[in-house]
């Protein structure tokens, strides 16, 4: 780790740079959804911290982003349904050699710039689209535009057999993108990570399918308590290429090519408990994927993911507490990769457990602590090392909302085990300072 004086100077520089951005524009503009609803970001996000959703934020998303006025309604233009989101910061890796690239450790740089189209289309339909110019370590070019988050919805309440039922449909670009709980694959803590810090070699396949697939599904929310969804995901090519814009499909290993339509299911139960709310749920997906995205033919590798999760929130104006837990196990059948030699075994497994909690003091600052453990079977050909990919990671994060449009974040990742090894694991520890600006 660099000397403490360097970190102090870095924090001072980060605050100073953000301060220059705040002074002339002080929250004169707000993100598109806030403009549409007339509410502050904290109405939908705990402490104003995107993407952690409040009960109202989950309701807003499930009802297809239709609360409030559309951009054009009542014969007049109401607001611009566009916004810009940017991040910049710096990462210090305990052993600079583990950064990607090593020279990037300690250097301030932009992380990404995102343009989003978000808002109500009709009384029953809404959209959330993001296109991002982001930095990817080791890629050529390192900076590139591409589709990011896509979620198009239609939803409407019905009375069925004396029960209130919200029925909806969704089209999105990744399993979990449509989910409203922060235990899901797409929106789990830590919500943000450094583009250059090292990470575990193994992760379940659905964690990496976003932007490679196009999904279509239907859901029902009964009495605002029981939620059930069934969706199917296919490769985002042909008429769905707009969902994978920017993906290097012609580059070996640049994408994941799935076979046919792959089922994803979600079932949750939630209830209000005074100022608190509780959710328990399960999620799963079965996926057939080709080992070579340039040759989508022949046999596939088969993945089955089954997970369970829970979340509890206690939210008041002054104090906000959230506790989350998730468990996911993936079983793998390398029907194609094993005969080709790109897998050392005919089958395998990965298990990920994520436990985390957060406290927010009003809408000003938040402190989060998480523990993520990944275990799995050894696979030298797949991971590039002979040991198991077992990794244990502690995450400590401090967030400060300078305004509802600007957030400062300091995140520390501490590894006690990294890709099967305890010795030297701390060399992958990292400190990540980041600033978020959304208008």
Task: List where the protein language model places each region.
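The canonical Cys-X-X-Cys-His
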Residues: 38-48
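Outer-membrane beta-barrel "beta-signal"
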Residues: 40, 426-439
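Outer membrane beta-barrel
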Residues: 52-54, 80-93, 100-238, 259-275, ...
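Sequence/structural signature of outer-membrane beta-barrel proteins
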Residues: 89-96, 132-139, 159, 174-178, ...
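Transmembrane beta-barrel architecture of outer membranes
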Residues: 110-112, 144-151, 164-166, 213-215, ...
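Detector for outer-membrane/organellar transmembrane beta-barrel domains
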Residues: 277-396, 400
């Amino acid at each position: 780790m660099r000397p403490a004086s360097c970190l102090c100077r870095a924090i001072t520089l980060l605050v100073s740079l953000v301060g220059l951005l705040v002074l002339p524009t002080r929250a004169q503009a707000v993100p598109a959804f806030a403009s549409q609803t007339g509410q502050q970001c904290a109405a939908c996000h705990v402490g104003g911290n995107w993407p952690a959703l409040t009960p109202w934020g989950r309701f807003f998303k499930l009802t297809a982003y239709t609360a409030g006025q559309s951009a054009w309604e009542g014969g007049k233009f109401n607001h611009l349904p566009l916004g810009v989101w940017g991040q910049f910061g710096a990462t210090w890796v305990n052993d600079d050699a583990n950064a990607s690239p090593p020279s990037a450790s300690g250097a301030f740089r932009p992380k990404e710039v995102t343009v989003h189209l978000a808002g109500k289309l009709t009384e029953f339909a809404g959209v959330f689209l993001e296109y991002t110019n982001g930095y990817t370590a080791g890629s050529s070019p390192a900076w590139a535009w591409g589709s990011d988050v896509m979620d198009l919805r239609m939803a409407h309440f019905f009375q069925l057999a004396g029960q209130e039922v919200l029925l909806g449909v969704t089209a999105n670009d990744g399993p979990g993108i449509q989910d409203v709980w922060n235990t899901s694959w797409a929106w789990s803590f830590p919500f943000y990570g450094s583009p250059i810090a090292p990470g575990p070699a193994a992760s379940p396949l659905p964690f990496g399918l976003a932007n490679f697939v196009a999904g279509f599904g239907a859901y029902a929310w009964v009495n605002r308590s029981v939620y059930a969804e069934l969706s199917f995901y296919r490769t985002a090519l042909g008429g769905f290429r707009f969902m994978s814009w920017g993906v290097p499909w012609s580059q070996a290993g640049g994408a994941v090519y799935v076979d046919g339509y792959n089922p994803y299911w979600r079932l949750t139960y939630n209830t209000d408990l005074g100022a608190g709310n509780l959710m328990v749920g399960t999620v799963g997906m079965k996926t057939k994927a080709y080992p070579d995205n340039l040759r989508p033919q022949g046999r596939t590798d088969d993945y089955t993911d089954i997970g369970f999760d829970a979340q509890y929130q206690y939210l008041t104006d002054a104090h906000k507490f959230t506790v989350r837990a998730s468990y996911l196990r993936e079983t793998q059948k390398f029907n194609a990769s094993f005969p080709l030699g790109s897998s050392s075994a005919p089958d395998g497994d990965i298990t990920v457990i994520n436990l985390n909690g957060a406290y927010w003091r009003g809408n000003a600052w938040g402190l989060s602590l998480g523990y993520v453990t990944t275990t799995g079977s050894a696979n030298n050909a797949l991971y590039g090392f002979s040991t198991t990919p077992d990794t244990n990671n502690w995450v400590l994060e401090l967030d400060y909302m300078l305004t509802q449009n600007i957030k400062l974040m300091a995140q520390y990742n501490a590894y006690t085990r990294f890709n099967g090894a305890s010795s030297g694991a701390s060399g992958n520890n990292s400190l990540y300072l980041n600033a978020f600006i959304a208008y």
